[in-house]
């Protein structure tokens, strides 16, 4: 919300285009795959999967920046299985697990495992600056602006 290029004005302009708001990426990706919608904002692996199946879609990463969310994982501080949970996190971050992620068309968090076919290296994708504390603080106001913009 505090970005002059991608903040409130951008969201309000988006709302003027009557976007389809779906509860998940699946319906949006199917809309663009069928040609019912000319563009959609979805997780990148879905576009790669659709293209691999012959759908006439192309993936574009915004030059203004893309969010980077790759298989989030964490350990609850009050977990009774701290050691097991940490071992699982360590596995998820291992070279072997990240190679599996790449094979499943996900962008890895490691730089030594490559990327899915026809996907740029992570270093070549402009990523958004994500201040998680600020995002959390601004969440309610951002949701309100978004809901107002897309429901009018």
Residue ranges with predicted function:
Residues 45-48, 64-67, 80, 94-98, ...:
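Solvent-exposed loop/turn segments at secondary-structure junctions
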Residues 55-67, 76-79, 117:
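Short beta-strand->loop
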């Amino acid at each position: 919300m505090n970005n002059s290029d991608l903040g409130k004005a951008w969201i309000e302009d988006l709302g003027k285009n009557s976007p389809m708001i779906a509860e998940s990426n699946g319906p949006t990706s199917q809309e663009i795959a069928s040609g019912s919608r000319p563009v959609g904002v979805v997780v990148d692996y879905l576009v790669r999967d659709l293209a691999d199946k012959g759908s006439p879609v192309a993936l574009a990463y915004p030059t203004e920046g893309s969010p980077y969310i790759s298989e989030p994982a964490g350990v609850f501080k009050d977990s009774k299985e701290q050691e097991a949970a940490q071992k699982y996190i360590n596995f998820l971050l291992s070279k072997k697990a990240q190679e599996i992620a790449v094979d499943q068309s996900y962008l890895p968090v490691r730089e030594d495992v490559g990327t899915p076919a026809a996907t740029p290296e992570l270093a070549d994708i402009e990523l958004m600056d994500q201040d998680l504390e600020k995002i959390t603080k601004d969440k309610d106001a951002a949701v309100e602006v978004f809901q107002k913009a897309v429901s009018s």
